[in-house]
Amino acid sequence: MSQDYYQILGVSKTANSADLKKAYHKLAKQYHPDNAAAGDTNAEKKFKEINAAYEVLKDEQKRAAYDRFGHDAFQNQQARGGAGSQGGHPFGADINDIFGDFFSDFMGGGGRRKPTSSKVRGSDLKYNLTINLEEAFHGVEKNISFSSEVKCDTCHGSGSEKGETTTTCDACGGVGATRVQQGFFMIEQTCHKCQGNGQIIKNPCKKCHGLGRYHKQRNLSVNIPAGVENGTRIRHPGEGEAGIRGGNNGDLYVDIAIKPHDIYKVDGANLHCKLPISFVNAALGGEVAVPVIEGGKVNLTIPAGTQNGDQLRLCGKGMSKIRSTIRGDMLAHVHVEVPKNLSKRQRELLEELRGESANEKENDGSFFNKMKSLWS
């Protein structure tokens, strides 16, 4: 068995990247051709071995492959992959090509890139849809209109005239790419003849010009489920743009925006509203009819002594929830209204009430009396 890369660098198999780098720099400096004696071929050979070892071990993926398959297997693959290459690369071939073939052979591949398909998946589309709060509560079906690429109905997405077939590109052998030698490296580039498709259409469809799709205005009915929230995204599989030359369609994403409501403010599944009541109802209590999101009104009990800013809750009268029979609550925020214009009789009654209230305050040592005593 030949000396492996760890032995060449003089490090253990558990060496970290810092140890590898330190060992490499030390040895590279020692055996660099500029520092070697004239005619010392051993130094040049050693220098190449050091570079080859470091090129593999400094790369985590390549090092993992080397550790897994062993030095001899790697060397055998190098011998096959390096035949006919030029440029004086330490491995005699592009390191990426070597490892590409290396993995292919061990995983059952043949070292050749598989032919590419000319089919390309269509792009996804996004549509912004605005609905009102009632529609969000009940759910709604909406008709939307948008422009997109659709499958050609003449060639049925193939890109060829009726009855015509595609042929494999003779420039790239159907892989969609060709390789060009540039210095030490083998560069892969898109095939100029088939534009990366791997196939040649000899007689393109006149309607879609060989793409298998064309631009069209579309109308689509979309279902918005009850309980959607502002910002909900709904996916419609296969309703995006048609693929190229028979490729799969993309998806359509509908983003929901809910318009602000005149009465309600939304907080998750709960609804908040302002509830104006008279100061008489606030003091004495009673019932008021309040509108609800599903339509109509329900009676809400006002407890006696309700204060301005109090919250009154109607359980189960909020928004729907997606895939649930449970609803949120409605919270009414009390706003006590004080009349600005009083009749003579109303004024007399309030004056009478004020007199009685003053007597009560004096007897119970109220806050107002305590304040009064501070200033007396």
Curated annotation (Swiss-Prot):
<dbReference type="InterPro" id="IPR018253">
    <property type="entry name" value="DnaJ_domain_CS"/>
</dbReference>
<dbReference type="InterPro" id="IPR001305">
    <property type="entry name" value="HSP_DnaJ_Cys-rich_dom"/>
</dbReference>
<dbReference type="Pfam" id="PF00226">
    <property type="entry name" value="DnaJ"/>
</dbReference>
<keyword id="KW-0235">DNA replication</keyword>
<dbReference type="InterPro" id="IPR002939">
    <property type="entry name" value="DnaJ_C"/>
</dbReference>
<feature type="binding site">
    <location>
        <position position="172"/>
    </location>
    <ligand>
        <name>Zn(2+) 2</name>
    </ligand>
</feature>
<dbReference type="GO" id="GO:0005737">
    <property type="term" value="C:cytoplasm"/>
</dbReference>
<feature type="domain" description="J">
    <location>
        <begin position="4"/>
        <end position="70"/>
    </location>
</feature>
<keyword id="KW-0862">Zinc</keyword>
<feature type="binding site">
    <location>
        <position position="152"/>
    </location>
    <ligand>
        <name>Zn(2+) 1</name>
    </ligand>
</feature>
<feature type="repeat" description="CXXCXGXG motif">
    <location>
        <begin position="169"/>
        <end position="176"/>
    </location>
</feature>
<dbReference type="GO" id="GO:0031072">
    <property type="term" value="F:heat shock protein binding"/>
</dbReference>
<keyword id="KW-0479">Metal-binding</keyword>
<comment type="subunit">
    <text>Homodimer.</text>
</comment>
<dbReference type="GO" id="GO:0051082">
    <property type="term" value="F:unfolded protein binding"/>
</dbReference>
<dbReference type="InterPro" id="IPR036410">
    <property type="entry name" value="HSP_DnaJ_Cys-rich_dom_sf"/>
</dbReference>
<feature type="binding site">
    <location>
        <position position="169"/>
    </location>
    <ligand>
        <name>Zn(2+) 2</name>
    </ligand>
</feature>
<feature type="binding site">
    <location>
        <position position="208"/>
    </location>
    <ligand>
        <name>Zn(2+) 1</name>
    </ligand>
</feature>
<feature type="binding site">
    <location>
        <position position="155"/>
    </location>
    <ligand>
        <name>Zn(2+) 1</name>
    </ligand>
</feature>
<protein>
    <recommendedName>
        <fullName>Chaperone protein DnaJ</fullName>
    </recommendedName>
</protein>
<comment type="similarity">
    <text>Belongs to the DnaJ family.</text>
</comment>
<dbReference type="Pfam" id="PF01556">
    <property type="entry name" value="DnaJ_C"/>
</dbReference>
<dbReference type="GO" id="GO:0051085">
    <property type="term" value="P:chaperone cofactor-dependent protein refolding"/>
</dbReference>
<feature type="zinc finger region" description="CR-type">
    <location>
        <begin position="139"/>
        <end position="217"/>
    </location>
</feature>
<dbReference type="GO" id="GO:0006260">
    <property type="term" value="P:DNA replication"/>
</dbReference>
<keyword id="KW-0677">Repeat</keyword>
<feature type="repeat" description="CXXCXGXG motif">
    <location>
        <begin position="152"/>
        <end position="159"/>
    </location>
</feature>
<dbReference type="InterPro" id="IPR008971">
    <property type="entry name" value="HSP40/DnaJ_pept-bd"/>
</dbReference>
<dbReference type="InterPro" id="IPR012724">
    <property type="entry name" value="DnaJ"/>
</dbReference>
<dbReference type="GO" id="GO:0005524">
    <property type="term" value="F:ATP binding"/>
</dbReference>
<dbReference type="GO" id="GO:0008270">
    <property type="term" value="F:zinc ion binding"/>
</dbReference>
<keyword id="KW-0346">Stress response</keyword>
<feature type="binding site">
    <location>
        <position position="191"/>
    </location>
    <ligand>
        <name>Zn(2+) 2</name>
    </ligand>
</feature>
<keyword id="KW-0963">Cytoplasm</keyword>
<dbReference type="InterPro" id="IPR001623">
    <property type="entry name" value="DnaJ_domain"/>
</dbReference>
<feature type="repeat" description="CXXCXGXG motif">
    <location>
        <begin position="191"/>
        <end position="198"/>
    </location>
</feature>
<feature type="binding site">
    <location>
        <position position="194"/>
    </location>
    <ligand>
        <name>Zn(2+) 2</name>
    </ligand>
</feature>
<dbReference type="GO" id="GO:0042026">
    <property type="term" value="P:protein refolding"/>
</dbReference>
<dbReference type="GO" id="GO:0009408">
    <property type="term" value="P:response to heat"/>
</dbReference>
<dbReference type="Pfam" id="PF00684">
    <property type="entry name" value="DnaJ_CXXCXGXG"/>
</dbReference>
<feature type="repeat" description="CXXCXGXG motif">
    <location>
        <begin position="205"/>
        <end position="212"/>
    </location>
</feature>
<feature type="binding site">
    <location>
        <position position="205"/>
    </location>
    <ligand>
        <name>Zn(2+) 1</name>
    </ligand>
</feature>
